[in-house]
Structures are given as C-alpha cells and as structure tokens.
Amino acid sequence: MSPQTETKASVGFKAGVKEYKLNYYTPEYETKDTDILAAFRVTPQPGVPPEEAGAAVAAESSTGTWTTVWTDGLTSLDRYKGRCYHIEPVPGEETQFIAYVAYPLDLFEEGSVTNMFTSIVGNVFGFKALAALRLEDLRIPPAYTKTFQGPPHGIQVERDKLNKYGRPLLGCTIKPKLGLSAKNYGRAVYECLRGGLDFTKDDENVNSQPFMRWRDRFLFCAEAIYKSQAETGEIKGHYLNATAGTCEEMMKRAIFARELGVPIVMHDYLTGGFTANTSLAHYCRDNGLLLHIHRAMHAVIDRQKNHGMHFRVLAKALRLSGGDHVHAGTVVGKLEGDRESTLGFVDLLRDDYVEKDRSRGIFFTQDWVSLPGVLPVASGGIHVWHMPALTEIFGDDSVLQFGGGTLGHPWGNAPGAVANRVALEACVQARNEGRDLAVEGNEIIREACKWSPELAAACEVWKEITFNFPTIDKLDGQD
C-alpha cells in the first residue's frame, strides 16, 4: 500500500454498513442538462422510509453496494454517483412513491441502450428492501441522444420512399401466424397487397420453422410484392422478419432481403435484444432498408402498474436503438392500452420535442434534437368499424394494421383489403372535409358501404365485435 493510499484510508475509511440516504438522497441537488433523469415508482418494504428506498435505488443502479468498500477512496463518488433528488407520494396509494433519480452522463457508454438499461433497470429490481419497483419514465439528454443513430430513416424519408402522403399507411399480419407453407403464405401476401394495402407482415414468431424456412418465405413474398406493384402501380412492402437465434444469422437474412430489392425488414427488438437491434438498424440505414419493429414480450415488462417498466421507456429506448415502425397498441382493439398514456408515448415516438405532461404520463420534457421519428403501429383486434377512431386517435403518421380484420373477410383476402382501404379513404376524406370522426364515424362508414360491397360485407361480419375490458395500467388518479 502506498503512503498516499494509507494516509487517505486512515482518515476517510470506516468499515461497516451505512444508510443509503446518507450519501444518495440529496434533495438539494440541482439537476444538470447532461444528466439522465429517471422517475421510479417505488414500493418500499414495511418499515423502510421512502427516502431510504429512493436512495437505495440511486445507489444500487449507479456506484453503490451494500457496504462501504476501500476502493471508494480511489475515485470521486460525488462525480459518478446517482442521486435521488426528489420523492413524492402517488395519489391514492399509501405505500407507493415516485422517486426521481439523476445519473451523471459519464456512467454510460455512448450509443448503447444495452449499457444504459443494464445500470438503470438491472439488479436493483431484485433489491430486497423494495416490495416492487417500476421505471415510469426517462429523460434522455441531448448530449446522450446525439451519440445514437436512431431510426434508420424516419417518417418523412419513409413517405418519400413509398411516395405515399396525407393518410395513415395500411398493413395486415398474415394469419394463421404459424403453419402455412411458403407458397400459400406468399399467395396471401399478394392478395392483400393487390387489394389495396401498403404492407403485409410476418407475425412476430415467424422465423424459420420446419413448415416454412425463411429463404423460401422471402422468395415467395418478394414475388408477391413485385406482382402486386405491377398490377396496382403502388409501392408495396412485406415486413420480412429477420429475427434469428444469432446476430450473424439475423444479418444474413437482412442481407438476402436487400439482395431481393424489397423495401423493409422486421425485428423483434425485445426478444432479439438491443445490441442486435442497433446493429440491424445501422445496416438498414447503410443499405436503404426500412425497419419494422415488433414489441413481443413487452407486456411481461410493462403491464403491471407497480413493477417493471412502462412502455414509454421501451419506446424511447427503441427510438434510440433504431426502428422506423413500432407496435404501440390500439386503444380500441383487443390489447391493453390506456388512451391518454398511449397518446403520450406516441408523441414521444414521433415528435422532435415533447413537453412534460403528467396527464398523459410524461414525467419529463424530452428534446430529441432532430433524431428521426418512428411511426406507431396500431395492431391487434381491429376491424373496419374501428377505422374512424383509429384515424382520429393516431392521425396520418401511423400504420393501421389489420390481421383478422383483413383475412377474416367472408369473400377472401383481397376483398378484405379492399374493405379496409375504402374505409380508410372514406375517413380521411371526411376528416379533410371537416367532419368529426369521433361523432360521425359510424355514419361515415355506412355511407361508404353504399359504394363498396366489400366494405358492406365486412361491416356486417364485425358489427357486434367489441373488447370491453378495463385497462389494468391506468394513469394515477383515474378510477
């Protein structure tokens, strides 16, 4: 031991266990523009004060450990430690608190969502002093945002590539999701694209199974794309799922898609992982491919209100990691999604600058400093009667994706696509004429049925279908 170390240790080191709040709860701290800010929903164990719980989160997700260690004296903890700088009670919840934590930027590797999450949502979520812990929101500072490429292309570049403006894009997930041969799969793709859809999609668990290997699927889907483009005069695409068991295999599939000349590939970003996703996003930008992102596994992480991570955080992470589309719920369909909360993270996906708005679950003002935006995808249990609400809720910069709502049409796949396209065009025209889609939506659809027997048949099939279940993850203060 050197004399310098020995002297410092003799006056500054005291072995033992300290309360976290002595070092990591700093209500006087003024946050910096370069700090990453986090809002955690903390549920302390009985007998643990909220200040101690918040400080424990700050410590265990940054520089702290359970006891004082000698090597604390070899660095500047004041420079590197996370700080719990504010705690507030959650309305209507006696045992829950929002703990705000500031992290110095130097704690994180540049351009790495993987490293950021390993710290902020790592081992701390298993900490015994906490009964539950949920990350509600993150503020990503411009200094860190600028280290990421972000989406391969973004909303405006995608519209320019497709030459489609002034309306939402239309998609369809091919069903049944598993079991079709590659040729029959390609036939369904062709029929949907010919009928008027912009995109069709591999389901998230379509990779390369014995009944349909990936290369065969890619070839038949490419044939469907080119044939439908020739017949309609519109640019078409199919989300070819490149997700695979290894990053090398994923890239092989993306390269083959590029060689086929198709416009877009797909990745399951949570099951595939952020490192793989960021690599694929970089490849897509370099090679002119759009990237569709599916969020399979998200509800394991985000559905419970008191533990895990809200989807708005996963949405921000995806915008950093890279993707041109991401599934975002529907509000009106079969999947979980509170309206105000959904609109909040939809804005976080699309807009350059989003103000703090607790009524929509947004805890921090977020400045994306020109990072390209991501198109939200509404998908899951939607049909033609939902079209006015979807158009009103999501606006033009979105993808409305109907699986069963296309392929379940009584006359077949192409008429199902026609019905959706007619319904969308009717809603966009009515909106542009100043009509209120929220009030007149059903009337607008009925009027369009007079000119489209395909739409009339679809309306008859799905007139009674609803998904009336309460939302589990509501915003605080809602009954």
UniProtKB/Swiss-Prot annotation:
N6-carboxylysine modification, residue list: 201
Record: residues binding substrate: 123, 173, 177, 295, 327, 379
Subcellular location: Plastid, Chloroplast
PROSITE patterns: RUBISCO_LARGE
EC number: 4.1.1.39
GO cellular component: chloroplast
Principal subcellular localisation of the protein: plastid
Phosphothreonine modified-residue sites: 330
Site (Transition state stabilizer): 334
Reaction(s) catalysed (UniProt annotation): 2 (2R)-3-phosphoglycerate + 2 H(+) = D-ribulose 1,5-bisphosphate + CO2 + H2O; D-ribulose 1,5-bisphosphate + O2 = 2-phosphoglycolate + (2R)-3-phosphoglycerate + 2 H(+)
Record keywords, A-Z: Calvin cycle, Carbon dioxide fixation, Chloroplast, Disulfide bond, Lyase, Magnesium, Metal-binding, Monooxygenase, Oxidoreductase, Phosphoprotein, Photorespiration, Photosynthesis, Plastid
Propeptide: 1-2
Residues where Phosphoserine is found: 208
One Pfam family matching this protein: RuBisCO_large_N
PTM comment, free text: The disulfide bond which can form in the large chain dimeric partners within the hexadecamer appears to be associated with oxidative stress and protein turnover.
Record-level GO BP terms: photorespiration; reductive pentose-phosphate cycle
Cofactor note: Binds 1 Mg(2+) ion per subunit.
Listed CDD domains: RuBisCO_large_I
The keyword Oxidoreductase is assigned to this record: yes
GO MF annotation terms: magnesium ion binding; monooxygenase activity; ribulose-bisphosphate carboxylase activity
Residues that, per the record, bind Mg(2+): 201, 203-204
Function: RuBisCO catalyzes two reactions: the carboxylation of D-ribulose 1,5-bisphosphate, the primary event in carbon dioxide fixation, as well as the oxidative fragmentation of the pentose substrate in the photorespiration process. Both reactions occur simultaneously and in competition at the same active site.
Subunit and partners: Heterohexadecamer of 8 large chains and 8 small chains; disulfide-linked. The disulfide link is formed within the large subunit homodimers.
PANTHER family with a match to the protein in the record: RIBULOSE BISPHOSPHATE CARBOXYLASE, RIBULOSE BISPHOSPHATE CARBOXYLASE LARGE CHAIN
Additional free-text comment from the UniProt record: The basic functional RuBisCO is composed of a large chain homodimer in a 'head-to-tail' conformation. In form I RuBisCO this homodimer is arranged in a barrel-like tetramer with the small subunits forming a tetrameric 'cap' on each end of the 'barrel'.
Designated name of the protein: Ribulose bisphosphate carboxylase large chain
